[in-house]
A protein has these predicted regions:
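N-terminal export signals
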Residues: 1-4, 9-28
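Catalytic cores and adjacent binding grooves of peptidoglycan-active enzymes
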Residues: 4, 37-42, 125-184
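C-terminal segment of N-terminal export signals and the immediately downstream linker at the start
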Residues: 22-52
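A mature extracytoplasmic/lumenal domain signature
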Residues: 43-45, 54-56, 108-110, 142-144, ...
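Active-site acidic/histidine clusters and adjacent loop/turn architecture
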Residues: 57-107
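Extracytoplasmic/secreted envelope proteins and their assembly/folding machinery
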Residues: 88-92, 116, 147, 151
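Acidic helix-start/capping segments at beta-turn-to-alpha-helix junctions
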Residues: 103-117
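Charged, often glycine-rich, active-site loop that binds/positions anionic groups
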Residues: 113-128
Length: 184
């Protein structure tokens, strides 16, 4: 049975997220806290789209974060896990750096531990303790944007991990420690 994120949990996190805006990572402190932030995400596996402002008037918006969490769920199991709002901030910054409002195409968002273990057995390119399993990572691309430019933008903002997978045609972005790697 799929794990669902309860709205009450999102509201609790929303209160904490307001505090986290004060203690934002260095790269995110360049944002004007009163300016709205938006994300446009297309889940390639489910056909669902998230297009909304997720942050406005100095606060993350719990309903928007809940919808983004749903769109980024593990499409294999239906499980959901709250997605780190600073991941959306990273995507917002990447889109701004690329001067693009095109949707980020989701290859992989949240992965349940079960899905991650299965993928780890099939491929040495899947980390056993992946940031995907804690809602802090996304594998993506943007139609019409060179993958190398997407990687450069993700690296330039310094948000966390950036993996470049040119053969598989995606870039991994996470909000863990800053690091870079190249996969296949």
């Amino acid at each position: 049975m799929p794990t669902l994120v309860r709205r009450r949990d999102l509201l609790k996190f929303g209160a904490a997220a307001g505090i986290s805006a004060i203690a934002a990572p260095a790269w995110a402190q360049k944002f004007d806290i009163w300016e709205p932030r938006w994300a446009v995400l297309d889940n390639l596996h489910t056909g669902e789209r998230f297009r909304a402002v997720y942050y406005a008037n100095g606060s993350y918006l719990p309903d928007a974060l809940a919808e983004a969490t749903r769109v980024m769920r593990d499409w294999r199991t239906g499980d959901q896990h709250f997605i780190d709002p600073t991941l959306f901030d990273a995507l917002h910054a990447i889109g701004g750096r690329l001067e693009s409002r095109k949707p980020f195409q989701i290859i992989s968002g949240y992965r349940s531990p079960k899905t991650n273990a299965m993928l780890n057995r099939r491929s040495n390119g899947v980390a056993e303790h992946s940031q995907h399993t804690i809602g802090k990572a996304i594998d993506l691309r943007i139609e019409g944007v060179e993958l190398s430019n997407l990687r450069a933008a993700a690296t330039a903002i310094g948000a966390g991990g950036v993996g470049y997978y040119p053969v598989s045609n995606f870039v991994h972005v996470d909000t863990g420690r800053v690091r870079q790697w190249r996969g296949s």
